[in-house]
Amino acid sequence: MNHKVGFVSLGCPKALVDSERIITQLKAQGYELVPTYQDAGVVVINTCGFIDSAVQESLDTIKEAMAENGRVIVTGCLGAKADVIKNACPDVLHISGAHAYEEVVNAVHQYLPPPADPFTQLIPPQGIKLTPRHYAYLKISEGCNQKCTFCIIPTMRGKLQSYPMAQILTEAKKLKQAGVKELLVISQDTSAYGVDTRYQQVEWQGKTVNTRFYDLCEQLGELGIWVRLHYVYPYPHVDDIVPLMRDGLILPYLDIPLQHANSRILKAMKRPASSENTLLRIASWREICPDITLRSTFIVGFPGETEEEFSELLAFLKEAQLDRVGCFKYSPVEGAKANDLDNPVSEDIKEERYHRFMQVQAEISRNKLKNKIGSTQTVLIDEINDDQIIARSKSDAPEIDGLVYLPKTSGITVGSFAEVVITDSDDYDLYASLV
């Protein structure tokens, strides 16, 4: 019998971690993963359903797999809208929602029974990873308790469920032992970690620690590898993490989605609504840890956003001088409460505001990177090509931030650290030579 499974993982890093866990279980049970639809006995698709374009990509992928294979199991965020999938592809074998690991594996068993003898010994202790060997995503919780009006994640993934502290730290330790040099800490709401457990005390390596964000960062920092924080909601206790960055325990990098600067828009989004307080906190973080890199994301064209309110966002951007910024045009996600707000912004105006926003941030980024010329930086080597080496500094997360380009040199390996001198820059990337 064919025990080969095709697997497609769509969406964000959090979905990628879900895929890794499903694949680890399947491999442990003797299944073989194959890269083509034609060779697979069944195809599993982990979908994204956050915005309309992601829904369409997921549906297109399902249709493609159905056309080329015909035996498809669907899971992930879009699985929460089974009727949407069934309407587009009525013959899929099984549909489940996000982080339904056991349900997916059981569905594979149903339509493609496992081999008689599992091959658990072939699975590395850290499990199967879909990232390069030198970095890995570490998911610390599921779900979210926030009620942001532009978002439907709580509907798809439920309320906050923090993973046990010992489980997270054990996984992190195994990843380090497997050669991982950088952990990217992720969840839907990273800084809420432990709230749902009431900060339960647990034993870890002979000492008592609390199930809370600060303690988790502190313990991860003791591993002695890069630890990078993503999706950090701006709760007041986030301020307590910055000294850990200053002291070198975790990377001086904070990914903190702010979404807007105008108080009326923020209230309509159900987000923290004081840009003045945010600017004061940013100044405080930089005073405590001058090397901190601040990344954020914003939404333009939110329903009712006026030109004056958008101009306030641009003014905030110029004053905050954030290092890394992403921008999204508001997308009316089905089921989001923001869709019911008055005065939707036209697509033309959204597009125009998006480009104005990115022009302002490009200039900020260009000037910040120019100031790094002549400095010495520690970089992590990501790729070695025929004519150049591609690396990242402490300021650069994979996939979403800039890169550091080096001339091809012998003796350098992927996944190693190197000391470099910055020699040039552009809007988003740096160029360097080895020390």
UniProtKB/Swiss-Prot annotation:
A biological process term (GO) from this entry: tRNA modification
Alphabetized CDD domains for the sequence: Radical_SAM (cd01335)
Binding-site residues, [4Fe-4S] cluster 1: C12, C48, C77
GO CC annotations, alphabetized: cytosol
Domain of life: Bacteria
Limits of the TRAM domain: 370-435
Start and end residues of each MTTase N-terminal domain: 3-113
Note on how the cofactor is bound: Binds 2 [4Fe-4S] clusters. One cluster is coordinated with 3 cysteines and an exchangeable S-adenosyl-L-methionine.
Keyword annotations from UniProtKB, A to Z: 4Fe-4S, Cytoplasm, Iron, Iron-sulfur, Metal-binding, S-adenosyl-L-methionine, Transferase
SUPFAM superfamilies: Radical SAM enzymes
Binding site for [4Fe-4S] cluster 2: C144, C148, C151
Annotated compartments: Cytoplasm
Enzyme Commission numbers on file: 2.8.4.4
Record's protein name: Ribosomal protein uS12 methylthiotransferase RimO
Organism this protein belongs to: Legionella pneumophila subsp. pneumophila (strain Philadelphia 1 / ATCC 33152 / DSM 7513)
